[in-house]
Each structure stands twice: as structure tokens, then as C-alpha cells.
Amino acid sequence: MTKLQVAIDLLKTEDAIALATKVAPYIDIIELGTPLIKSEGLGAITAMKAAFPNKKVFADFKTADAGALEAQMAFEAGADYITILGATGDSTIAGAVEAAKKYNKGVVVDTIGVKDRVKRAKEVIALGAEFVELHAGLDEQAEPGYSIQVLIDEASRAGVPVSIAGGVNMNSIEGVKKSGAVVAVAGAAIYGAEDPAAAAKALKEALA
């Protein structure tokens, strides 16, 4: 079954934990967004893992260099997953993968900025990434003509474990499920909802 990941793009640890508390019954993976980590530091990861020891905690570092070092930092802080940019060099990804093996954790490669996402997805899985996040960032989503259907189609063609992030909501969740994605990543559809718990519950039920 496709897992549900909440991407928390808030700026304060206490706000992130408060949101996670509301949605935790329906979420498999809790993602600390890049702005949150930059705002609050590694302590946000440690606090989230302490609050939810039975959930997977995903640190969206978007690492572009020093893969082994940054992965070690994330894992020692309590993260179960770290993101490395797919647009970076293979050696950076491989370094993070080596660190992940030591800690029994996972590397996720983020395809922001990658032109041929399907090709790169296959390459980085071969390097040892656990899965690949087919990701349209907030800026790309705001561009005229953007459609999550592009990511859904790519997931169907990839033939490797992928997640989809970039406009996952109740309108697109069925397509995400049918694509074969291992994880559906919802951000604003949950944290921007009037009732985040109800929004998360509806998405989780749609994936069942």
C-alpha cells in the first residue's frame, strides 16, 4: 500500500509538532521541510523523533555536497531519511548511502532541477537510494501550466521505487496510488487545511 508522508513547511518546531500530533494517526512518514530545518536547526529533527519515536522522520536537507557528512548529521539527530539532490554528483549520493548503511537509515533522492527524472531515478536507485522523490517544488507548481499528472506519468514509467510530491491532494491522490508510487507526499493539502486531521484521514483512506 502507498504510504502517506506529510511535508511540514512551517517555521517553528512547536508548530510542526502540534500539526504532527493532529495528523499522526493517519501518517506513515513525518517530513521536516527544508525551511523548518533551516529555521530551527537539527534540534527540530531530534524533537520530532522524540515526540514520535514510532514514526519515520524525514529530514528534507536537499544536500548538494558533503553527502556523507550531512547524512551523518541528520541520522545522529534522529532522522530516518535524508534527501540528497538528484542534480548533484554521484559521489555525493554514494557518500550519503554509505552513511545510511552505517546507521541503518535511508537516502531519498529529490529530483528538483533534474531534466530527465525517470532516467536519473534509475541511476540513483542503482547507487543505493531507498526511493526517489519525483518532486515539483513550490516554485515549479506556481508556473503556468503545471500539472501533477506529469509526475504521475513518470512514476508509472520509472520502474523503481518513487514517491510523488508536488500537488498531492484529494483530486490527484487516486492517480498517485495507481501510478505505483511507494509514498504520496502531501504538504499544503494537509497543513493548509481547515481541519488537518480530517484532510490526512481522507488522503490515507483514499490510499487504502
Name the predicted role of every residue range.
Residues L4-I8, I30-L32, V57-F61, I82-I84, ...:
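Hydrophobic faces of well-ordered beta-strands that scaffold small-molecule active sites
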Residues A79-S91, V132-A142, S179-L203:
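Glycine-rich phosphate-binding active-site loops on the catalytic face of alpha/beta enzymes
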Residues A24-D28, A51-N54, E76-Y81, K101-G106, ...:
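Glycine-enriched alpha-helix->loop->beta-strand junction motifs that scaffold or abut catalytic
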Residues M1-L69, F75-E76, R117, E123-L127, ...:
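Conserved N-terminal beta1-alpha1 strand-loop-helix module at the mouth
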Residues K38, L42-F61, G95-G113, G145-M170, ...:
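Alpha-helix-loop-beta-strand connector modules within alpha/beta enzyme cores
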Residues R120-I152, A199:
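Glycine/Thr-rich beta-alpha phosphate-binding loop at enzyme active sites
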